[in-house]
Amino acid sequence: MINPEIFFDQLHEREFDFFVGVPDSLLKNLCACITSKSHQNNHIIAANEGNAIGIAAGIHLSTQTIPVVYMQNSGLGNCVNPLASLTHPDIYNIPMLMIIGWSQL
């Protein structure tokens, strides 16, 4: 298991400073770390995964930074359309780092 504090610090060193996502029980330690260590204005808990992608896209367009999006694997279906339309290289080409908790069913 990755230590969430070390992982967060590594992200921060690489200028990944904005976080948005839907909390996941598998990522609960990382979510707690993000909540405690990031600036209040740099962390948004989204209502659903598609919203998280949209918020991340808006952050990139307004700041030119690369946001971090976190979610559970069951939420991937909710973000297919925003991902396909906003991150596609021939459309808006918006980068984002995605962290997806993977439950083994």
Please report, for each region that a protein language model flagged, where it lies by residue:
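Thiamine diphosphate
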Residues: 1-105
